[in-house]
Regions:
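Noncatalytic luminal/extracellular "stalk/propeptide" segments of secretory-pathway proteins
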Residues: 29-33, 41, 45-162
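Alpha-helical metal-binding/catalytic segments enriched in His/Glu/Asp
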Residues: 67, 277-328, 461
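Soluble metallo-hydrolase cores and metallopeptidase-like ectodomains found primarily
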Residues: 106-136, 213-291, 299-307
């Protein structure tokens, strides 16, 4: 089911979306699409940028250099934390009545635990399906569990301010490929020596390399994921369902780096007044889109730095934070809010930029993972009518098709914009949610992104910031 055009809320926003183009926007001042895409391709080749790893450090240094070269004042905030990094993972099964075999592993549970090079071995026991687990009789054994991905019920939590294009059908729910079990400590406390988590409702190609869940504290028990068919086979061999049972050897070699440094950047472009607009993202992530918001911000910073200060009513502040993938230790945008209360008081609006250029990839009925030929839905979350209207006006004539500007009336704030909203700032949180968001293949999912879409989205943000800059602060806060 989908929300039809007749069900859209905010008729005034729809009228704005049909209005004139943003006159203050100067496309010739924006870095070219080729330049932006070249940055994107370079970034993807770095590999996963898990918080504080060498690729992430290199990316943050690149962003800082680009922002400084555009004339912005760039400050760094350093954090340290115990960085965990997986080195090698493997799962071997020795059934009582079959030949031993190596089970294909789709990925590992981040910050779960680690084993010696020889792994840990124990009887494979099926401990249930999420969320109902049987924790008795797991001592010294390897727990096998399975799960279905959680549904995000857009139709229940969001009310659209408007949709671009207006005749597009915004889905009432999605089920992105995300691990649904966020805590393994219950199995560790029950005495298990390892956990195997089996996907049940996505293809193996979709499940491959998923770094999920992220931002969890150490679990103190190693966990590996297997695909749908492998999970079904293991379940048929595991106790108590199988008469003879099977032994499993789970290997997850990992290393922890205590006191690993990681930096947040705060770049400032002074305007004609002390009032500020925050444009933020995070810099750590798994692939080419998670997180490429920093590339978008570099393009935006270069664009606005080429406009005379006298024509920029407000100061632009660009926090590019670390810690999105290390939440137990590093506060990401919450750290900026806590440390700079005067900035927050002077900020009249915020735009959070995440996950640019996403094209839609879905599992078909036969579990064939493929491109649909459409853009991924971009969900722009905002609680205030003024910010919603600003984005809808910016979207007029945009190539960023399948954008939903929504009011989170029943929750559903996702991403780095949530904390800014809680701090009382009218915020637009732009957050596409593709299946591959947390996947970390060698190519960084670059083939799933569109240079044209990414560039169009950056243009939309530039126009939105222009519009926000001209709206009085008192009007921006009106719901």
């Amino acid at each position: 089911m989908s929300i039809s055009r007749r069900e859209f809320l905010g008729s005034a926003a729809a009228a704005l979306a049909a209005g004139a183009p943003v006159e203050s926007y100067r496309p010739n001042l924006l870095p070219s699409q080729k330049e932006v895409w070249d940055w994107q391709v370079w970034m993807a080749k770095l590999g996963p940028k898990y918080t504080g790893n060498p690729a992430h450090v290199q990316f943050v240094d690149f962003l800082a250099a680009q922002l400084k070269s555009a004339g912005l004042e760039v400050a760094r905030e350093r954090y340290t934390f115990p960085r965990w990094e997986a080195r090698r993972w493997e799962l071997s099964i020795a059934p009582a009545s079959e030949k031993p075999f190596r089970a294909p592993v789709t990925s590992y549970f981040p910050y779960s635990g680690q084993t010696p090079a020889s792994g840990v071995t124990g009887e494979l026991v099926f401990a249930g399906s999420n969320p109902s687990f049987r924790l008795d009789q797991l001592h010294g054994k390897i727990a096998l569990i399975d799960f279905a991905c959680n549904v995000r019920k857009f139709g229940e939590i969001y009310e659209p301010w408007g949709i671009h294009p207006a005749d597009a059908a915004f889905p009432t729910s999605i089920r992105p490929a995300r691990g649904a079990v966020n805590d393994l400590t219950q199995f560790q406390k029950a005495g298990a020596v390892g956990v195997v988590l089996a996907w049940t409702d996505v293809s193996d190609a979709n499940a491959a390399d998923q770094y999920t869940p992220f931002s969890r504290p150490p679990q103190n028990i190693p966990g590996l994921y297997v695909g749908r068919e492998t999970g079904a086979r293991l379940r048929s061999l595991a106790s108590p369902l199988a008469s003879g049972g099977a032994k499993a050897t789970l290997i997850l070699e990992a290393q922890t780096f205590p006191d690993s440094p990681t930096d947040t950047l705060i770049a400032t472009l002074a305007g004609a007044s002390d009032e500020s607009i925050i444009v933020n993202t995070h810099t750590d992530g798994t692939n080419a889109t998670e997180e490429n918001g920093g590339i978008g911000i570099v393009a935006l910073a270069r664009y606005f730095s080429r406009i005379p200060k006298s024509e920029r009513k407000r100061t632009l502040v660009f926090p590019l934070t670390t810690g999105h993938f290390a939440g137990p230790w590093v506060p990401s945008i919450r750290g900026v809010i806590t440390k700079y209360p005067e900035l927050i008081k002077k900020t009249v609006a915020a735009v959070t930029v995440e996950h640019l250029g996403c094209r839609e990839w879905m599992d078909g009925a036969s579990f064939r993972y493929r491109a649909t030929g459409e853009n991924e839905w971009s969900v722009a979350i905002t609680e205030t009518k003024s910010t919603a209207q600003a984005l809808l006006e910016a979207l007029h004539g945009s190539a960023s098709r399948r954008t939903a500007v929504v009011n989170p009336v029943h929750g559903g704030w996702l991403g780095e914009g949530a904390s800014l909203t809680r701090a009382g700032i009218p915020t637009i949180g732009y957050i596409p949610q593709p299946n591959y968001l947390l996947a970390a293949p060698a190519d960084g999912c670059i083939e799933k992104l569109s240079a044209e879409l990414m560039y169009s989205q950056i243009q939309d943000f530039a126009k939105t910031i222009h519009i926000l800059d001209r709206i009085p602060a008192i009007e921006l806060k009106k719901s």
